[in-house]
């Protein structure tokens, strides 16, 4: 199931970019259908009737959307909503009495309670949680701004307004479906290198770091996302 979901996740930005750059309604519907499958994959594989009903209803709706002049419009908002949601997930853990999200992850990697982490590591992981929340919020706003001024078919253009500055749909799509992921990936790798320098001896390599994250298991990640 993990591999299937990962393949679907990798397929989405490709489909979304091609749909956005070409203004292709069929590809847009396929990209949105890909998202539906990502969300419903587990209950679909378990044969849940409600999941199949939702999937069939979504498929019917996307079939009609594919032929609409507004078929690519939802793709403008998907990167904004998804990135903003992840930024919120980081930010909500920074409130009083909460354990910052990165602190919880590092404590799990260290095999101890968050309060048992060394004070410098606790401070670092809190600052890192702030950094991720800010970076993702900025990316969400950038996605929204570019979606608004994309021509043709951007948010302002769709409302009949002429944007003060404009980018092409292809330029918006490259940022939303490629460059944004590159920024996140680069920040992730860069932070690993910084952490390895500041707190040496914890990970043998980047591959070891990823392996240890994976070994935390689905139950840990589900609980983490629930907050």
Positions of predicted regions on the chain:
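Membrane-proximal helix-loop-helix units in multi-pass membrane proteins
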Residues: 73-132
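N-terminal membrane topogenic signal
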Residues: 1-7
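Residue-level signal for alpha-helical transmembrane segments in multi-pass membrane proteins
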Residues: 11, 15-18, 37-44, 61-62, ...
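Structural motif marking the loop-to-transmembrane transition
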Residues: 3, 25, 46-50, 73, ...
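Long, highly hydrophobic alpha-helical transmembrane signal-anchor segments
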Residues: 41-85, 155-169
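C-terminal membrane-adjacent module
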Residues: 114-227
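Structural signature of hydrophobic alpha-helical transmembrane segments
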Residues: 16-33
């Amino acid at each position: 199931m993990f591999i299937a979901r990962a393949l679907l996740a990798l397929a989405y930005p490709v489909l979304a970019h091609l749909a956005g750059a070409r203004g292709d309604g069929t590809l847009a519907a396929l990209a949105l259908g890909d998202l539906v499958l990502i969300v419903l994959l587990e209950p679909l594989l378990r044969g849940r009737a409600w999941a199949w009903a939702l999937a069939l209803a979504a498929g019917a709706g996307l079939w009609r959307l594919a032929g609409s002049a507004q078929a690519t419009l939802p793709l403008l908002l998907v990167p904004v909503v998804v990135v903003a949601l992840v930024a919120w997930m980081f930010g909500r853990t920074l409130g009083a009495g909460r354990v910052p999200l990165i602190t919880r992850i590092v404590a799990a990697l260290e095999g101890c309670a968050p309060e048992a982490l060394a004070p410098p590591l606790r401070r670092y992981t809190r600052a890192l949680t702030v950094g991720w929340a800010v970076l993702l919020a900025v990316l969400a706003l950038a996605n929204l701004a570019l979606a608004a001024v994309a021509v043709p078919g951007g948010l302002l253009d769709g409302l009949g307004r002429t944007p003060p500055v404009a980018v092409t749909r292809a330029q918006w799509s490259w940022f939303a479906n490629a460059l944004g992921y590159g920024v996140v990936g680069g920040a992730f790798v860069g932070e690993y290198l910084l952490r390895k320098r500041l707190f040496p001896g914890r990970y043998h390599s980047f591959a070891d770091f990823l392996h240890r994250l994976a070994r935390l298991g689905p139950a840990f990640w589900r609980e983490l996302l629930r907050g």
